[in-house]
């Protein structure tokens, strides 16, 4: 009985945490010229494009979640990157979450992906295209060792490194988030061509995918860009700090109440949802 109660409590907590946000009630892009508004973790988008789910160069995972919307620049980036990967014989690029039709906050799994400028891409490059069943329930390939200190050699490949490098060399890309162990391996393998490593940033989790972020489009006047990453390849003390044990007394940060929406995003919600 006690176990059942605990299980039910866990289910209720999980269900509450995954309660739908107002943004999920918007099922189609908001008409208008493409405008990314606000910050990556507190914003929205007008005039989002839909990434075509049929392509010779990429495949879209979990299409039932309808998270394949983004700024036209993001759609073009995905098409550009996957074409380059195909030309180099790397394999099929697997596209994960982009954003919802009007952007905005997800009910779980992402703090960002709100302005149509973020995309998750699996760090797998299958030579044979995945079936629809595989795409709907994708199996992530964990590239990082259990202790988090290095990649698993049998799962790492130069093709994966090439895909990340291709993305980082794209002029529209400002950041790529990967696990610290993946960044470390890229640093070891890079050789003398290292400028692109500046954009590759170590971050929690991200053991099986990279999270690519584009710069704010020049004509999205209400879009808030992040500062550029620090100069250098990011392979020194900053990276090594990720592998050090937590300092005594360190606790996980408490979840914060979401900040107020940018006025244009609130107006969008008021018109289309509330």
Swiss-Prot record:
Zn(2+) 2 binds at residues 147, 150. Its main location: periplasm. Its cofactor is Zn(2+). The keyword Hydrolase applies. InterPro entries: Hedgehog_sig/DD-Pept_Zn-bd_sf (IPR009045), Peptidase_M74 (IPR005073). It comes from the Bacteria. Its EC number is 3.4.24.-. GO terms for molecular function: metal ion binding; metalloendopeptidase activity; serine-type endopeptidase activity. It is found in: Periplasm. Residues 1-19 form the signal peptide. It is an enzyme of class 3 (hydrolase). One of its GO terms (cellular component) is outer membrane-bounded periplasmic space. Zn(2+) 1 binds at residues 110, 113, 120, 211. Residues 225-274 are annotated as: Disordered. The keyword Signal applies. Binds 2 Zn(2+) ions per subunit. Zn(2+) ion 1 is bound in the active site. Zn(2+) ion 2 is bound at the dimer interface by residues from both subunits. Keywords: Disulfide bond, Hydrolase, Metal-binding, Metalloprotease, Periplasm, Protease, Signal, Zinc. Disulfide bonds join 44-265, 187-235, 216-223. Murein endopeptidase that cleaves the D-alanyl-meso-2,6-diamino-pimelyl amide bond that connects peptidoglycan strands. Likely plays a role in the removal of murein from the sacculus. Belongs to the peptidase M74 family. Dimer. This is Penicillin-insensitive murein endopeptidase. It comes from Salmonella paratyphi A (strain AKU_12601).
């Amino acid at each position: 009985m006690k176990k059942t109660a605990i299980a039910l409590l866990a289910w209720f907590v999980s269900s509450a945490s995954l309660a739908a946000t107002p943004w999920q009630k918007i099922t189609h892009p908001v008409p208008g010229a493409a405008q990314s508004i606000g910050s990556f973790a507190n914003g929205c988008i007008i005039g989002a494009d839909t990434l075509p789910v049929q392509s010779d160069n990429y495949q879209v995972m979990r299409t039932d979640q309808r998270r394949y919307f983004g700024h036209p620049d993001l759609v073009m980036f995905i098409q550009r990157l996957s074409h380059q990967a195909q030309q180099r014989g790397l394999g099929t690029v697997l596209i994960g979450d982009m954003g919802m039709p009007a952007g905005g906050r997800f009910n779980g799994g992402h703090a960002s992906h709100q302005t149509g400028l973020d995309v998750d891409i699996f760090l797998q490059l299958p030579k044979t295209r995945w079936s629809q069943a595989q795409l709907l329930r994708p199996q992530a390939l964990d590239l990082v060792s259990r202790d988090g200190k290095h990649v698993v050699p049998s799962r790492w490949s130069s093709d994966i490194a090439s895909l990340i490098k291709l993305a980082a060399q794209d002029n529209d890309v400002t950041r790529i988030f990967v696990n610290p162990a993946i960044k470390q391996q890229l640093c070891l393998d890079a050789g003398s061509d290292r400028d692109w490593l500046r954009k590759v940033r170590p971050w929690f989790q991200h053991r099986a995918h990279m999270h690519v972020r584009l710069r704010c489009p020049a004509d999205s006047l209400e879009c808030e860009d992040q500062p550029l990453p620090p100069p250098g390849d990011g392979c020194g003390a900053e990276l090594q700090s990720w592998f050090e044990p937590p300092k005594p007394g360190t606790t996980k940060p408490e979840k914060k109440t979401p900040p107020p929406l940018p006025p244009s995003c609130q107006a969008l919600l008021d018109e289309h949802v509330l």
